[in-house]
Amino acid sequence: MSKETTFADAVVEALNRAKILGVRAGTEHRYTGVWTVVVDGRVFARSWNDKPTGWFRAFRKQPSGTIQAGDLEIPVRAKLVRSARIRDAVTAAFAEKYNTKGSRKWVEGFAEPERVVNTIEFVPG
């Protein structure tokens, strides 16, 4: 397991540029496309729901996994975000990054309290 607590700047930039990343808990799950945002150099995702078979619940059960961005496959650990300040910053970052008319419904949905609690941070794994 990596002792690093933050990703290299080049990795953060690549993750920030990507609109959709593949995420996979463990090694047996398939990659699932998710929206991610970067806040203060840290990488976050938020699940639309908390289904027992979904990616969010898989990371809650098995925090180690992989992020896929283009040709990059990056080992990660997922950490549940409890800080209201960080959750609010993530909500704002979603609105800024995904600012098209077609994204509006999803951005507004991600701001709902039942989804805000589904915020995780990816750290080097």
Task: Annotate the PLM regions.
Residues 1-21:
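Extreme N-terminal tail/first-helix region
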Residues 3, 16-17, 39-40, 70, ...:
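General secondary-structure edge motif
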Residues 6, 40, 100-103:
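Serine/threonine-rich low-complexity intrinsically disordered regions
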Residues 7-10, 30-32, 107-108:
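A generic local structural motif
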Residues 12-13, 35, 110-112:
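Short secondary-structure boundary/capping segments
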Residues 17-49, 57:
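Short beta-strand segments
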Residues 29, 50-125:
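Short, structured beta-strand-loop surface elements
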